[in-house]
Curated annotation (Swiss-Prot):
Plays a key role in the replacement of histones to protamine in the elongating spermatids of mammals. In condensing spermatids, loaded onto the nucleosomes, where it promotes the recruitment and processing of protamines, which are responsible for histone eviction. The keyword Lipid biosynthesis does not apply. The modification Phosphoserine is found at residues 9, 37, 40. Belongs to the nuclear transition protein 1 family. GO terms for molecular function: DNA binding. GO terms for biological process: chromatin remodeling; flagellated sperm motility; heterochromatin formation; negative regulation of DNA-templated transcription; nucleosome disassembly; positive regulation of protein processing; sexual reproduction; single strand break repair. This is Spermatid nuclear transition protein 1. One of its GO terms (cellular component) is male germ cell nucleus. It comes from Sus scrofa. It is found in: Nucleus; Chromosome. The gene is TNP1. Keywords: Chromosome, Developmental protein, Differentiation, DNA-binding, Nucleosome core, Nucleus, Phosphoprotein, Spermatogenesis.
């Protein structure tokens, strides 16, 4: 019983999460990086790192 339950939940989770996530990642991140220059990306990373270190 536990195994079948696990499989069901796993399948449901995968179906619900995987498709939208992939779409968002493909449409948003890739396009953003392409449009924005490497410099701006680096600056964003640095800012994030500093913010994290402060916290």
């Amino acid at each position: 019983m536990s195994t079948s339950r696990k499989l069901k939940s796993h399948g449901m989770r995968r179906g619900k999460n995987r498709a939208p996530h992939k779409g968002v990642k493909r449409g948003g991140s890739k396009r953003k990086y392409r449009k924005g220059s490497l410099k701006s990306r680096k600056r964003c990373d640095d800012a994030n790192r500093n913010y994290r270190s402060h916290l």
